[in-house]
Structure formats: structure tokens, C-alpha cells
Design a protein with these regions (language model features):
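ABC-family P-loop ATPase nucleotide-binding domain
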Residues: 1-51
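ABC ATPase NBD Q-loop/coupling interface
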Residues: 95-118, 155
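A short, proline-enriched helix->beta-strand linker immediately N-terminal to the Walker B motif
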Residues: 199-203, 219
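Conserved ABC ATPase "signature" region
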Residues: 103-104, 157-175
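Conserved ABC ATPase signature
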Residues: 180-184, 188
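Hydrophobic anchor residue at the start of the ABC signature
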Residues: 194, 206, 222
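P-loop NTP-binding/switch modules centered on Walker-like glycine-rich loops
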Residues: 73, 210, 214, 218-262
């Protein structure tokens, strides 16, 4: 099979259907009535005159080692949902229950920023735009290694060895780790972002339209890479996209979002 062709996974189920062979006690993520409302301000004193209901009562679950596709048109609240789950935005209301590696269930909405920090090792995000999500003043080594330094996982020679391994895992030559993002193509930049996401061995990944900014031929390569890594590492993934033809190749179930609701 050509590397520019996506691997077929067969038919997918919609979000309300139960995956075969799964038990109800293996949820890794359960979202209940999640709301994310942004204030609308007007006038000299910038008083709140209303709210934009970007996410308005969204509920779904995600099982261990499952890929759930969250699809919908632009502006429907998909990305905001993903960012709210990871607490990049503080949700207005609702519950986001996450089962940690030790089996403990915790409502992410109710914990503090300090309590959230260790969870960021288990919950990671792949950003949509490989051009703006990478710091142009940092080398690839620094970009991929930054999470390892922040969480005090590795430094020095061990850090370089880990970065080299991560680059190899995503199909990049480790000899290029001293280069800067502008020296890579769009597909290669997305692979750099993927390596950064995988650096802390996460259990849950929110992939925010990871191929929408890429050429069609490159999309297939990145999708196949995501599928291979998911199968090899046993990852759980919320895959956000606006194109059903993309999600059908990697997702087990699909949730369709429209004007802030599923």
C-alpha cells in the first residue's frame, strides 16, 4: 500500500452506540453536560451584555484505547470542547471525569491549576496548525524536549537520547534536531508536534484537526502514522475534524456537533 493512501478501518459507529467487546467500567473520560460560555462585552465600561454559547451541554464518553471522532462544521464548538476538557479553558459548567493511571476518577472541572499540572503528563493535545504551534526561535530538540524539562523527566544526554527516539518514532531524522521549524515542511512540522505530544507517554490525546492544514497527499501519511502509534502505544484519542472522510479511517465511533451541541 502506498504511504499516501490511508488504511481502511471499516464502518464506524456513532457516539451513542456501544463498541463491541467493551464493558461500561472502562471509561477513561466521561463528559457530562459540559458548557463553555464566553461573555459578550459592549460599551465604554465593557459591560457583559450576553454570552456566546460555544459549548452548550455536551455529553459523551471515551473508552480505554478507543478513538472517538468529534466532527462538525467550522465554529460549532469542537475545538473549544477539546480545550475545555484539557482545562486550556476553564469550563463554565459541567463535569469532566478522567480516570487516572492509578484508577482514581477525578472531575477535572473542579480541581485547581496546581492539581491539574501532573495530569498534563497523561493528557496531551495535538494542535491544528503546525506553523503557529511551534516556537520559531526554538530548535526541534528544545521543542520536543521542553515538556520533559518542565516535568523534570530528563535532562542533558538523556534528554537528547529521548528526543532522538521520539523523532525516529514519528519518521524524522534525529540528525535534524538542531534545526528550526521553518526548515521543515508542513507535514514534518506536524510530526514534530506529534513527537512533542508523545514525549510524556500520555494515555489520552486530544487531536485538534491534526491534518486539516496539510496537503491531501501528506494527510494520508500523518493519518497512517497516528494509527500506527495509537495501535503500538495503546492510546486513547479524541479526534476532532470537520471531514467525515478523514475520521472514518481512524475512529471507532463518531459524535456529530452542531452549534455547541452533540
Amino acid at each position: 500500500m502506498s504511504q499516501n493512501q490511508t488504511q481502511s478501518r471499516g464502518p464506524v459507529d456513532f457516539a451513542w452506540q456501544q463498541p463491541n467487546g467493551k464493558q461500561s467500567d472502562d471509561y477513561i473520560l466521561e463528559v457530562k453536560n459540559l458548557k463553555q460560555h464566553f461573555p459578550i462585552r459592549s460599551g465604554f465600561f465593557q459591560r457583559v451584555v450576553g454570552h456566546t454559547k460555544a459549548v452548550d451541554g455536551v455529553s459523551f464518553f471515551l473508552r480505554e484505547q478507543e478513538v472517538l471522532g468529534l466532527v462538525g462544521e467550522s465554529g460549532c464548538g469542537k475545538t473549544t470542547t477539546g480545550r475545555s476538557i484539557l482545562r486550556l479553558y476553564d469550563p463554565t459548567d459541567g463535569e469532566v471525569w478522567y480516570r487516572k493511571a492509578n484508577g482514581e476518577r477525578i472531575d477535572i472541572v473542579k480541581i485547581t491549576s496546581n492539581e491539574m499540572k501532573p495530569l498534563r503528563r497523561e493528557m496531551r493535545m495535538i494542535f491544528q496548525d503546525p506553523f503557529s504551534s511551534l516556537n520559531p526561535r526554538m530548535t526541534v530538540r528544545d521543542i520536543i524536549g521542553e515538556p520533559l524539562i518542565i516535568h523534570k523527566v530528563a535532562k542533558g544526554r538523556e534528554l537528547e537520547d529521548r528526543v532522538a527516539k521520539l523523532m525516529s518514532d514519528v519518521g524524522l531524522n534525529p540528525a535534524y534536531m538542531r534545526r528550526y521549524p521553518h526548515e521543515f515542511s508542513g507535514g514534518q512540522r506536524q510530526r514534530i508536534g506529534l513527537a512533542r505530544t508523545l514525549s510524556l507517554n500520555p494515555r489520552l490525546i486530544v487531536a485538534d484537526e491534526p491534518v486539516s492544514a496539510l496537503d491531501v497527499s501528506i494527510q494520508a501519511q500523518v493519518l497512517n502514522l497516528l494509527q500506527e502509534i495509537k495501535d503500538e502505544l495503546g492510546l486513547t484519542m479524541l479526534f476532532i475534524a470537520h471531514d467525515l472522510s478523514v475520521v472514518e479511517h481512524i475512529c471507532d465511533r463518531i459524535a456529530v456537533m452542531y452549534v455547541g451541541k452533540i
